[in-house]
Regions:
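Partner-binding and oligomerization surfaces adjacent to conserved cores of proteins
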Residues: 1-318
Length: 318
């Protein structure tokens, strides 16, 4: 099911400064996944990958040993290395850590939303857990039309050099049914890559399955970026995951075939430079914002009045 069929509207929570920037510049910031508030959440998928990779490593390792002309010597080496199972465990862990290390360095870039709630009060007033995160400064929720957002993403992809853009729901760690439905088909694309990597290790030669791994790794990076701890399930999070094309992916094309490269921008946060991209900035089109919810604040009515002045002449409701 498409996100737009499940959620007619998406909620993006932000500060006053963030809201003004979004309205004035007609764009949304997507932050590099390594600089999210909790990057460690991207490691949640590791155990699932080990479950996927271990039987493949075991099978390929067994084939290598059984087919080796000096099988007895190889088995002796394995036995002195704590045994076959321990070697498989070690190689599986090394392989999975290597997969994380080789995720494309320039992406994905992520923008987060909350999907509609089954509780109409929350849809009308915003989510309390989100408002708490803004403390005394208060916050705002921009309510987007999901279908129109999807159409704008298609235009963004067609106009600029991306390898992939998607708008999809987060999968939470206690939802095995959705994991199997959404992630297993994608992660299965890694099977050929894993088999090729093990053959590389055993035979010392580059396997074609390893050379042609871009799509498999893009699927892995997408799953990694959309898998989240069950403790956040209330948020019904939906994410834009954008993969700007990197130069190597465009080599070999004539200049006339190249789309303009997506500009990367940086902002300072806690003394560090954080890379991000500005989605929709070059489309010269208003964002599909239907209304803005003003969060709890001691001067809430004044904020509502200020917003109405700012949005005069637009169709955005407050």
């Amino acid at each position: 099911m498409k996100v737009s069929e499940r959620y007619k509207r998406l909620y993006h929570y932000t500060t006053w400064g963030g809201l003004v920037g979004i309205i004035e510049n007609r764009c949304l910031w997507a932050t590099h996944h390594r600089f999210l508030n909790d990057y460690s959440e991207t490691l949640l998928l590791k155990d699932k990958l080990i479950e996927l990779a271990k039987p493949i490593v075991q099978e390929e390792s067994r084939k290598f040993v059984d087919g080796h002309p000096d099988q007895r010597r190889i088995m002796k080496i394995i036995e002195t290395s704590s045994g076959f199972d321990a070697v498989v465990d070690h190689n599986t862990d090394v392989l999975v850590r290597g997969m994380y290390a080789t995720v494309p360095s320039d992406g994905p870039y992520i923008t987060s939303f909350c999907g509609e709630s089954k509780d109409e009060y929350i849809n009308a007033n915003g989510m309390l857990s989100q408002w708490r995160g803004y403390g005394q400064d208060g916050g705002f929720a921009l309510v987007f039309d999901t279908q129109r957002m999807g159409c704008m993403l298609v235009k963004e992809y067609e106009r600029l050099a991306y390898s992939h853009i998607e708008l999809d729901r987060v999968v939470y760690s206690n939802d095995e049914e959705r994991f199997k439905e959404e992630f297993e088909p994608r992660l299965s694309n890694l099977r050929g890559f894993i088999e090729g990597m093990i053959r590389c290790i055993h035979e010392g030669a580059l396997d074609p399955m390893v050379q042609n791994h871009e799509n498999a790794f893009r699927d892995f990076a997408s799953c990694m970026s959309r898998y989240k701890h069950r403790g956040f399930k209330e948020e019904n999070e939906v994410r834009i995951c954008a993969f700007p094309a990197i130069r190597d992916e465009k080599d070999g094309l004539d200049k006339d075939q190249l789309k303009p490269e997506k500009e990367r921008t940086f902002r300072t946060k806690n003394g560090e430079q954080v890379p991000y991209i500005e989605l929709f900035k070059t489309l010269d089109q208003d964002l599909p914002i239907e209304r803005i919810i003003v969060g709890p604040h001691q001067n809430k009515e004044a904020r509502v009045s200020a917003l109405r002045v700012m949005l005069h002449g637009t169709s955005i409701k407050v």
